[in-house]
Amino acid sequence: MSKLVQAISDAVQAGQNQDWAKLGTSIVGIVENGVGILGKLFGF
């Protein structure tokens, strides 16, 4: 769960700094961690 929070924080900071490459990778991290958490919840 802390990885998801960190990915969201990174995305917000990248957006504020207009670092579009980091913003893109942070969004991928958010999706990746979110899917991982859902997988654990549903037993995948």
UniProtKB/Swiss-Prot annotation:
Gene Ontology terms for molecular function:
toxin activity
Q: Which GO terms describe its biological process?
A: defense response to bacterium; killing of cells of another organism
**What subcellular compartments does it reside in?**
Secreted
Q: Which Pfam families match?
A: PSMbeta (PF05480)
GO cellular component terms, alphabetically, are: extracellular region
Major subcellular site: secreted
Origin superkingdom: Bacteria
Record keywords, A-Z: Antibiotic, Antimicrobial, Cytolysis, Hemolysis, Secreted, Toxin, Virulence
Q: Name the family.
A: Belongs to the staphylococcal hemolytic protein family.
What job does the chain carry out? Has hemolytic activity and also inhibits the growth of gonococci.
What is this protein's record name? Antibacterial protein 3 homolog
> Per the UniProt entry, what species is this protein from, by scientific name?
Staphylococcus haemolyticus (strain JCSC1435)
